[in-house]
């Protein structure tokens, strides 16, 4: 009996040691203090923050208002809209108080003698991170995820470490509402010294068929000496959680090169929007026979092809993108990430028949990408609205030359294992596209994509068609993406070598839910005394169009590979056509769905064409029109049916 007790004690101790060896990842959500304003001494451990506001992260400090016309007034000429003279833009960034400096403070405990990393999914913006009074890292771009090893700054016993984050948003730094603060999650990651770093795995599928898939896993190992023997045991789990294959490999880290394992998955379940099957690779890392890390990588098995003149193929089947562009805010909820709200948005889009999302014009929250993996949406992930030439006085151009490569690498490493991502975009309507050296900048960014992820093509949203056809810019991009300019698709196809055209941004029809204007006719930049737009879906801006043109292009040509409509949802800021001295307008009217997540009439137009599994019959406008007695009120039907009869 005594021997059994000793054995049991040894087993318990062994289990405890193994548990301690596992990584831990914690969301730092609660027990934060926040204050608007600049307090340089707030980085120090002994700073008194008791009078600060208690907040929960994610947190958008600006969404609480108040709305005010004077918040971030911008006197600019929007060259993308062909404006030549500057004018006062009211509500361009939503009329919310995002400008200024704010501080966040909290504390955390970790075990002693561990490696500790802080991962920020996004911090708006110019984030300076302090641990125990010392600056641990700086990251200027508020949309990107970044991480920093804070081990050197920790208290020796790992207890009561002070974390302070300073954020600053400058005026005229955005064309829409960016949000403010720690609006995405903050992760505390604790590992052994030898471990897999953040985004430390890369999974590719060199061969995919119905019979089998070849899966390649490359794993980075940090802090392993050249003499350390590394053993990695990896199991591949199927979508239903069963182990379908496993490998054990030994070796030594060779000059920082990743550890490679290759697998065969028989009869794979292929990822697609209709069947978003997800696998998982679970890797255990041993250093000199001691378990030091366990790391899980979710991935999908699917094959993408872009074939000249033929179009886009997913798993061998031809299809066209039925996509929308979305900004990152959640309307009245602000920019703070909210998984339930994102899921609700995607559910509405799924029912409409949408199968793709463009993250305009910035890196998305990881939660959105994970939901697209799970719910079956293809993604075009896009990082930048400007490069080295400014759109906004205090925009990203200030950091581009120094930070662009680092921002690109973080984005690519963060999302290259997600099967939903089927292409990268390197920018949106950047003024650099017309620069004499614009193609060199584009090539610089595209080459980074090819280097870090050779499995996906690159596009760019181009609106200056004459420039990019003449200067080599469009010819160099893997997949030419045209924003609007539907009348020039054929010309671009004829002149460019790729023999494919993507509608990277289309339509921009404007409408207000439940508002109908008479007489009913096509209009550009129409404005009314009530600051609304007609929901007859016949109004657009001077530079945009109604949906019909884009549908016709999709029907007529195999070489058009689909579209991303501007936008799926209304968003805060950019209230075209009421963007010039037109307060109180402070949100867009482009959305197929409004700020409250209520579908507009246009939703049913897209649903009738895109959702081929559902019946759609939607009639507009409504029935009662006091004051229009004796006048003709046009009735419009959106339906998938070849014919139907309306009886009044």
Locations of regions flagged by a protein language model:
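Short glycine/proline/serine/threonine-rich loop/turn segments at secondary-structure transition edges
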Residues: 155-159, 267-278
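Extended substrate-binding grooves/exosites of carbohydrate-active enzymes
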Residues: 36, 64-66, 134, 185, ...
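Extended carbohydrate-recognition surfaces in non-catalytic/accessory domains of CAZymes
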Residues: 22-116, 173, 179-182, 194, ...
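Bacterial Sec-dependent N-terminal signal peptides
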Residues: 1-23
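Intrinsically disordered, low-complexity Pro/Gly/Ser/Thr-rich segments with frequent PxxP/GP/PP motifs
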Residues: 249-267
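Accessory beta-strand-rich segments of carbohydrate-active enzymes
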Residues: 26-28, 35-38, 94-199, 224, ...
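Beta-strand-rich binding/interaction modules
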Residues: 214-250, 634-645
